[in-house]
Amino acid sequence: MDLRRIMETVNMIDNENLDLRTTTMGISLLDCIDSDSDRACQKIYDKITTKAENLVKVARELETEYGIPIANKRITVTPISLIAAASGDSDYVKYAVTLDKAAKAVGVDLIGGFSALVHKGYQNGDRVLIKSIPQALKETERVCSSVNVGSTRSGINMDAVKEMGQIVIENEKINPLNNGNLVIFCNAVEDNPFMAGGFHGVGESDVALNVGVSGPGVVKTALEKVKGESMDVVAETIKQTAFKVTRMGQLVGQEASKRLGVDFGIVDLSLAPTPAQGDSVANILEEIGLESVGTHGTTAALAMLNDAVKKGGIMACSHVGGLSGAFIPESEDAGMIAAAEKGILTVDKLEAMTAVCSVGLDMIAVPGDTPAETISAMIADEAAIGMINNKTTAVRVIPVPGKDVGDSIEFGGLFGYAPIMPVHKESSAAMINRGGRIPAPVHSFKN
């Protein structure tokens, strides 16, 4: 291999915050279903601790051998609403506690899949699981929860949208930080390696390894070398950089899955920022030519970034999937935090940006007195963008008790901190309380 390219990669890791954001093992729990919940939980614990026994060990071996940092080791499982429904239990907290114990036993950072898919309606297990979310997140440390409330083919379940607004407020009363582990989706994907929205879909193999790459710092550094060039050159530079980053993800993912004896799933092409300086998606947009993220032109710059990352990534990897785009979490990106503190970046602008990027309103801190119906309306808006544009959108919103615009909340670690962002005071309650379903769009009829 060209020595220059090797040195380039070494420099990316040492100076530009390049890492693999996550190696995530997806495990099917369909063979753990049992009408006795105690037996089911034992089967779940046994399967996870057997299949993922060496996940952390192998990841650390690969870090040492290749010199590539792997920031997180995670697990996703089949949505628990499907697994627990056979039990007839009135709450599923014990399933969440079992997942937490298994995650700690194998040493992973997070485990996702305390989830329900209700985009067209509820089965009984979905209702029980959703009502269990606040207590489940209270009693666990590493469990992540997600609920899919809409899809392009099914429309939006507005009853579920209303309920999830209430669940967010219930979480706030217990511990507002618990909402960092809850994502409400439209068009959720089955092979997402990122948290908190990851779960292992029923169409997946028994066990699969999915990889999520990082690399905003690498992209920004590459763009610093093409100042003043046309947008064609900017897009091409991003493409070439994304190719290199994704190649690394494919290499580690395939080698890890081989050593673990499991299927290699996908590489998720998402640019995932962290609060560290130089690891920001917002800074990339500013390098493209914006004085601050959030000003006019932000959506166009983000659209180009997202598309160029995908074009570069799909050439580098045989299987791409997950969310695959730029993440724009408020609290996990130093540039986003700075723009939000100045009032340049607003919830409305973030909503517009989600129409062209990977996820949605992510890690948004809002005033503690925000009504449940307003949270539900934010979820509905994001779900509508996802439904109409045939893409994944999501909401991870954090109302903070006793805080208002001008205050901030410290999450710590990977979650960083977030200034409280203003939301509209005008009520959406009458619309949210209608319930029912928003029908699927006309262009969803593809057959």
From Swiss-Prot:
InterPro entries: UPF0210. Pfam families: DUF711. Coiled coil: none annotated. It comes from the Bacteria. SUPFAM superfamilies: PFL-like glycyl radical enzymes. Transmembrane segments: none annotated. Belongs to the UPF0210 family. Homodimer. This is UPF0210 protein LBUL_0934. It comes from Lactobacillus delbrueckii subsp. bulgaricus (strain ATCC BAA-365 / Lb-18).
